[in-house]
Amino acid sequence: MRKFRFRATYAAVACAGIVLGTTAAAHPSAGPGAPAGHYAGSLADGATWIADVPDGWNGTLVLFSHGYTPGPANPPRDAPTPAAAAALLAEGFALAGSSYAQPAWALGTAADDQLGTLAAFRHQIGRPRTTIALGQSMGGLVSAELAERGAGRIDGVVNTCGLLAGGVDLNNYQLDGQYALQELLLGNHDIPLVRYSSPADGQATANALTALAGQAQPTASGRARFALAAALMNVPTWAVGQPQPARDDYAAQEQAQYAWIAGGLLSFIDPARYTIEQPAGGNGSWNISVDYGDLFARLPDRDEVVALYRAAHLDLRADLRHLTAAADITPDLPAVRWLDRTSNTTGRLTVPTLSMHTIADQLAPVEFEHEYARRVSAAGRGGLLRQAFVQAVGHCNFTTAEYVTAVRAVRERLHRSGWGAIADPERLQADAQSLGLDGAAFIHFRPGPLVNHRRLAAARPEAWPWAAPAASPAR
């Protein structure tokens, strides 16, 4: 194992709009010639960055994009976990990452902040032979953006638990589920679902909807309708601390979905919606004109819902018709355009990309991977993308070995003309086990579709159904 040591950071100097922390012996040099140590600095927009270089640097920089940070604290991070940092450094990788210019939904500057961090690393420490962008959660969306616009600076990408369908689909899938909870279990529009004036408003909505879900559990009809709402919100049918339910154990699947809601899932989602609406300039989600019968027909968990509705002697088609007829939430068009411009993926990859997901992720549904692969294929870049799945439950619940293996796989791909078997689960599993760390669980898996995707028509807003004079007003 390579020894890693930290060195003190000294005074900052300004260069090309970048404020840099420096070590006494630091001089720009190529690849492994750079001195080992810890570096820190800041960018012109206020983002801060850190970097760590090990003894025996192998010449590859891992540029880490971190996930959502509620704030107000906004520290820079250069690895997904302390254990992953130690393991990557021991493998000879250098690490770097920024805070982004602001906490919370930072997509307005995040990709630029990461590229600015790379520029600072090159100036202060040295030019890496290769740079691999590694992203986690919201940072997975950032690294996916770098895969599209970082050619010449980024050589390869690892996305983990990424919000790969982008901010519009993120808000829309969450809206679909919460709208169904309110409409089917309460029967009115008294709980605000969008356009919050503060995080406290979002928390109040989360509390009210969580209470509704709990009140539904004692009855068969309540559980069936809750299951429909949970399925529309892509809530996993496997929960932390529970055995994975059998494919046809629909009662256990519904209980797992309820465990996620009772455990506080909405208390993260709804206050976070406020922090997305603020930089976007309004509500970027909608359900007016959405056909919930069409969505249901494509749901991965529709068998569960059908079974529970039958057991409760409820009319599923009637409930779906009601959801469609009552849907009247409209977007603020500038917010949709902002999210589409800053917080989205097109699939137009420019570098090899490996995307990794647990199969039961409550905050970044594994269905995002299906949507991401669809976009990449439609853009004609399917040969650059590989996806890896882990038999685990929870958001970003990866082992250290899985993180290191994913980075090693992309580095190997950069030395070959194609992927070959590099990202096959058997190959990934064997590599992870060979590290002697904390194990791995790579499996063959095919995610279902993200049915909540709405096609954007930002170039022709007059053609959008809600833009017509007869459309219901926003609420």
PLM region spans:
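C-terminal His-loop and adjacent cap/lid subdomain of alpha/beta-hydrolase
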Residues: 29-475
